[in-house]
Amino acid sequence: MEYFNLFIKSVFVDNMIFAYFLGMCSYLAVSKTVKTSAGLGLAVTFVLVVTVPVNYLINKYLLLPGALSWISPKLSSVDLSFLTYILFIAIIAAIVQILEMVIETFTPSLYSALGIFLPLIAVNCAILGCSLFMQERNFSNVGEAAVFGLGSGIGWLLAIVAIAAIREKLRYSKVPKGLQGVGISFIITGLMGIAFMAFMGIKI
């Protein structure tokens, strides 16, 4: 039940887009069609499911003050927390590179549709932000970190697919010239963010 609560909270209450507005660059740039948005959302979800648990282990057994005591008691005073950003980003970049090669090999059409935004997942602030949130919340085990990564990824996927579906409908609507494109997308994102705030009233 604890894992389920964490998952629901990660998807709806602490949604990376609607609660923290992380990953907005690719969210706005790629969300022109549902198909492409779903592909990028699944890619982001995969990266989060892999990187958050891996970064949890790195944080627990390498970065935290005294984390190296499992190697030798003499290393209990070593603090490598200053390497957090470097190592987290390195892990994310490595996973994204592997994912990029897999997508290019098996689904070239999706690879072409995503374009530059696929390798840019490595610097997507939602990916790094999720690992930093994991570190801040002091999860008790790697399972919680994995569930948090999965929930955050699905929440991001839900957000980008929702905005893409709305933007597809907007093509047939009379949007004022000054709001066409990114302008109306920002307004819709804000309205959906307000709607998602309703989930904050749910005690989980």
PLM feature spans:
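Helix-coil boundary and interhelical linker segments in multi-pass alpha-helical membrane proteins
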Residues: 1-4, 60-82, 131-146, 201-203
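C-terminal transmembrane helix-loop-helix hairpin of multi-pass membrane proteins
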Residues: 5, 140-204
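Structural signature of hydrophobic alpha-helical transmembrane segments
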Residues: 5-18, 78-92, 147-159
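Generic transmembrane alpha-helix signature in multi-pass membrane proteins
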Residues: 21-29, 100-106, 117-118, 125-139
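Hydrophobic core segments of alpha-helical transmembrane domains in multi-pass membrane transport
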Residues: 22, 26, 44, 49-50, ...
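C-terminal ends of transmembrane helices
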Residues: 22-36, 96-110, 163-174
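Cytoplasmic-side transmembrane-helix entry/capping segments in multi-pass membrane proteins
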Residues: 36-46, 86-88, 110-121, 176-184
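Ordered, amphipathic secondary-structure segments that act as subunit-interaction surfaces
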Residues: 60-114
